[in-house]
Curated annotation (Swiss-Prot):
Native source organism of the sequence: Methylobacterium sp. (strain 4-46)
Keyword rRNA processing assigned: no
Pfam families reported for this sequence: GreA_GreB (PF01272), GreA_GreB_N (PF03449)
A molecular function GO annotation: RNA polymerase binding
Protein purpose: Necessary for efficient RNA polymerase transcription elongation past template-encoded arresting sites. The arresting sites in DNA have the property of trapping a certain fraction of elongating RNA polymerases that pass through, resulting in locked ternary complexes. Cleavage of the nascent transcript by cleavage factors such as GreA or GreB allows the resumption of elongation from the new 3'terminus. GreA releases sequences of 2 to 3 nucleotides.
Native organism taxonomy: Bacteria, Pseudomonadati, Pseudomonadota, Alphaproteobacteria, Hyphomicrobiales
Gene3D superfamilies given in the database record: Transcription elongation factor, GreA/GreB, C-terminal domain (3.10.50.30), Transcription elongation factor, GreA/GreB, N-terminal domain (1.10.287.180)
Name of protein: Transcription elongation factor GreA
Amino acid sequence: MDKVPITIRGYAALEEELKHRQQVERPRIIQAIAEARALGDLSENAEYHAAKEAQSLNEGRVLELESLISRAEIIDVSKLSGTKVKFGATVQLIDEDTEEEKTYQIVGEPEADVRSGRVSITSPVARALIGKGVGDTVEVTTPGGGKSYEIVGIRYVG
């Protein structure tokens, strides 16, 4: 099994979600199944089937989270430094077409959320940035087309 790089914050979020699913969602779903069973005929019991589907989805996510946690390689970004972009870096970019500034942190796949400025290490943006430094220009090919960015800042913050 391949290790999955992840920040301390990302690992904590996975553990919190797993705990919630095991200690809150699982008992809630079991209760919903019991209540639906008490209604009688299970063949046409929509509440029962909905609760069983919720149970299946929850247990699937629990297994996925347990796998991610067991394969996690936790990286303390606050202990990293350097002038080149690598995992954990927070990178400030200028879009060379629009002059718009963007900031992304390069994180592990399980914690990526583009809307929050966290891009996966395997994303086109991160792959283009890895190994580059301030002042470098990178070309990024995305589903929306090609973009050109200048790197104007690199920092490592936990």
